[in-house]
């Protein structure tokens, strides 16, 4: 039925880029990537993407002795709510201790299908699709076997569930578990907390805050990884 809830677990890998202004010895110590685990709960109408607290944190699991690079996320865990029927996306996140609710439209991107290219993920045959986002190529792998137009982190708009996404060289999402009929306690929640803002406004505030911190550090260009 339309109200069946599907649950997909994803692992996100974020590749770290030291940037030109980081001292070489610091860049050498910096880990190449870090991982997060997330859960997507979805129906035909909406979805909720949030931090997976059930499974061990992958950073701690792998020894996690990266000192200050372990990058334990301070503040709140980001949550993304997608309302497919009304094409609305809400992202709850924080920036230097202040909570925000980012409201934006949810337009399915103009995906280009590459039906000749396929790969297997968790036993599901997936088809490749791509889109351009500014200068970045986004590659998604979706399976028509799960006939729901859903995906991680607000990605959707393909004729099937998206089980993997790569954002250029910077981030990869990969499904690690698919439950077609989820019967657990977690619920799809529409976030309401936080100062309401647009994506454009949030990015502007973020840039200003990062510049402030840079100035406080004497202009030392420590690259900061903050993502709403």
What feature does the model see in each segment?
Residues 3-228:
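Extended soluble regions of mature proteins
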């Amino acid at each position: 039925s339309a109200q069946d809830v599907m649950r997909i677990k994803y692992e996100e890998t974020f590749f770290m880029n030291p940037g030109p202004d980081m001292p070489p010895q610091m860049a050498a110590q910096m880990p190449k990537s870090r991982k997060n685990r997330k859960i997507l709960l979805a129906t035909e109408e909406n979805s909720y993407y949030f931090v997976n607290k059930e499974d061990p944190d992958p950073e701690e699991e792998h020894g996690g002795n990266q000192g200050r690079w372990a990058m334990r996320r301070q503040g709140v865990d980001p949550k993304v709510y997608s309302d497919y029927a009304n094409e609305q996306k809400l992202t709850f996140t924080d920036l230097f201790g202040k909570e925000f609710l980012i409201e934006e439209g949810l337009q399915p991107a103009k995906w280009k299908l590459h039906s000749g290219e396929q790969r297997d993920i968790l036993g599901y045959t997936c088809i490749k699709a791509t889109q351009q986002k500014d200068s970045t190529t986004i590659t998604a792998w979706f399976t028509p076997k799960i006939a729901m137009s859903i995906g991680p982190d607000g990605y959707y708009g393909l004729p099937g569930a998206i089980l993997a996404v790569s954002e250029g060289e910077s981030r990869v999402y990969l499904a690690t578990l698919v439950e077609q009929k989820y019967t657990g306690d977690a619920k799809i929640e529409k976030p309401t907390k936080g100062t309401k803002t647009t994506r454009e406004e949030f990015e502007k505030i973020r840039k200003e805050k990062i510049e402030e911190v840079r100035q406080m550090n004497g202009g030392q260009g420590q690259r900061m990884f903050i993502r709403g």
